[in-house]
Amino acid sequence: MAKEYSRTQRIGDQMQRELAQLIRREVKDPRVGLVTITAVEVSRDVGHAKIFITVMGQENAEQIAQSIKVLNSAAGFLRMQLAKEMKLRSVPQLHFHYDESVARGAHLSALIERAVAEDSQHGDAPAPEDAKE
């Protein structure tokens, strides 16, 4: 059986693809780096859309905030361009947010790698599963 997607999910997926191209092509502000749209959440009434982004190469919170500010100020222009590309009765208002999950995931991966490295250094003691054999 095919997986069911709601209308808002389909709109969000299409918006994600279209916005990625529009930002790359149309937004010429140097304060906006290499933006990746990680997710788009569209409200049930299709009136608002939260666009979650990451910015490659910008780890500084001020730079990220500046990129978000620029994208939010360009939201009207991007919305107008989306209206030309998408066949919708009304295009949602765009709200850009920084996606912290990618940075959090990288931090957790680093913690896990460090813990594994420490365990391998102290590897003299057998693991509890190995002791039973």
Swiss-Prot record:
The keyword Transcription does not apply. One of its GO terms (biological process) is maturation of SSU-rRNA. It is found in: Cytoplasm. One of its GO terms (cellular component) is cytosol. Monomer. Binds 30S ribosomal subunits, but not 50S ribosomal subunits or 70S ribosomes. One of several proteins that assist in the late maturation steps of the functional core of the 30S ribosomal subunit. Associates with free 30S ribosomal subunits (but not with 30S subunits that are part of 70S ribosomes or polysomes). Required for efficient processing of 16S rRNA. May interact with the 5'-terminal helix region of 16S rRNA. Belongs to the RbfA family. PANTHER family: RIBOSOME-BINDING FACTOR A, CHLOROPLASTIC-RELATED. This is Ribosome-binding factor A. It comes from Pseudomonas fluorescens (strain ATCC BAA-477 / NRRL B-23932 / Pf-5). The lineage of its organism: Bacteria, Pseudomonadati, Pseudomonadota, Gammaproteobacteria, Pseudomonadales. The gene is rbfA.
